[in-house]
Amino acid sequence: MSFIITLAALAFLMFVAYRGYSVIMFAPVAALLAVLLMDPSAVLPVYTGLFMDKMVVFVKLYFPIFLLGAIFGKVIELSGFSKSIVATVIGLIGNEKAMISIVLVANLLTYGGVSLFVVVFAVYPFAAEAFRQGNIPKRLIPGTIALGAFSYTMDSLPGTPQIQNIIPTTFFHTNAYAAPWLGCIGALFIFVCGIAYLTWRMRSAQAAGEGYGTGHTQEPEPVSERALVNPVIALLPLVVVGVLNKVFTIEMPLIYGATNETSLAGLDHRITSSVAALGAIWALELALLAGILTVVAFGHRGIAGRFGEGTKAAVAGSLLAAMNTASEYGFGGVIAALPGFIVVKDALAAIPNPLVNEAISVTTLAGITGSASGGMSIALAALSGQFIAAANAAHIPMEVLHRVAAMASGGMDTLPHNGAVITLLAVTGLTHRQSYKDIFAITCLKTVAVFVVIGVYYLTGIV
């Protein structure tokens, strides 16, 4: 019975996420209903002492990343830097290679620290223009943007500042550059297979006489290239974030040691920080802050007058994203404490391979919740100890666990109820019926890539 209750709680959360209801509201409802059916007297203590404790821990660790990332993306947008980068890349590669152009420019922006949602809004007008000039069906735009923004630059490439690559650092005491070779191999697999798939889809459509089409909704205004920011200046903040993230990642342990103790006159105790667990987060926070200041310094003319309103929207968006994921993390903490979850853990433990075990667990929960960070948070909150013990027994480095968890989170997360998918289709004026098939193909490629990387590790031992 306890197992059925646990599954019912997961199914309920999946249902409300799919229907578009607030996870912030329904994650605690799902968790506490499960507790109510087990032990009614435990509901309030579990809510305060477990659900909220887990939620607070997540916010404490990761909210600054959500906040600084959102502000960085917003000032990049307001300054016109993102438009300049997109226009430059497409101009260099050409409209005749529209798909590769859009994928690469989305790669550049997301790997530089711009949020996925900002990339969708920044890239779409240029994608529409390039596809129109190349007479490529508009319905292929979402799949193309998904390959560029929702895949390997989010979780595979070493050093990516996206949250999916940062969450594992606190569980496995790694940094954002964990397992660089495996990450690059996975990224190359997704890129090559993704481009091959999209090219095949384009040629099939053109062979059938299908072009860009007419009567579309959400058609953007023609892009004006007048007064675009110098592309070198526009790229500078992305370079600053990437370089300083690496520098601070190296320097943090040298400056603070493995553990740091700080005392202040007004405190009767020392503040103790595990630099092994927090170093990657601190490094990215400082790098994003430097990136924001770089944009403000070089793009203040475009930002002036709109900074206040723009950053308000960014802060609101970061709060929503962080609280959504924190609620799912709290949900995972409660579910992991229920008797029924023991059955789930035992079933997963029966999978003899720890990396396959981790990949299946994380990508399944990402699919259920419709969130890469949410699914990974639930899985690692509940099962990271089990993953670590199994990996240590098999002499698998924590870096490999990190990379597999990050890549698996970006596997089945992009199912139809995923927020980024819904936003992408809304912005492009297309429907699930028209374009989700291609997004799902990229989703399948991302999922397969995790197991390709696992296979490469076992065959070669490369990390």
List each model region and its residues.
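Short helix-coil transition sites and intra-membrane helix breaks within transmembrane domains
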Residues: 19-23, 59-62, 73-83, 109-122, ...
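Core transmembrane alpha-helical segments of multi-pass membrane transporters/permeases
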Residues: 25-28, 48-83, 108, 274-340
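Long, contiguous bundles of hydrophobic transmembrane helices that form the permeation core
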Residues: 38, 42, 181-310, 423, ...
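Hydrophobic alpha-helical transmembrane segments of multi-pass integral membrane proteins
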Residues: 63-69, 92-129, 322-330, 351-389
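Hydrophobic core segments of alpha-helical transmembrane domains in multi-pass membrane transport
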Residues: 5-17, 28-37, 66-71, 105-110, ...
